[in-house]
């Protein structure tokens, strides 16, 4: 059995370099919520050195709140902003002799696109128009995955090791109780349930089915490195291969 393990990087965390030795895919911030040209270049070089698949991590234009503010923007604006960010990272990747593999939206852009078909369509179209060979990463079972499929993109359904789930398969909003899982044992058990059994227990105790093709570890999390090591060990013990 194979699973992709991804992390968001280039967001100002000192652990990026070490984290990139543990994951198979990296989502690199493109400047709209965090990062800049130099951090993108540094992360690209580190990812290439470690054989990690490189992806763009576009966001709403919201550096003050780390891309976590809800915004209502015209789909055409989201299309243009997504293209802009993908293109910026793509130029750096190409200049370093690499190949960009995927796109995963960040924060509130990701969450809103999971439920808003018009926003999801704008993102999927931007990815397709830039490079139809790119993989579009989105919340498992979401509108973003469906939009990617309509554009005939390869999609990858994502689950979260350290986030609480609602009964409908969506993530618990960050400001609500149960949104973040701080207990390592609980996060590990949830991840293994999702990967091996295709199910997740919601904060209300309801089990729901989920497709896990890639697991996210938040690089800005306090215990990201320790948990990444623990998760890799758990996968190895169960003959689950971490591969992009």
Swiss-Prot record:
CDD domains: LamB_YcsF_YbgL_like (cd10800). One of its GO terms (molecular function) is ATP binding. One of its GO terms (biological process) is carbohydrate metabolic process. It catalyses: 5-oxo-L-proline + ATP + 2 H2O = L-glutamate + ADP + phosphate + H(+). Pfam families: LamB_YcsF. Its EC number is 3.5.2.9. HAMAP family: PxpA (MF_00691). Belongs to the LamB/PxpA family. This is 5-oxoprolinase subunit A. It comes from Salmonella choleraesuis (strain SC-B67). The gene is pxpA.
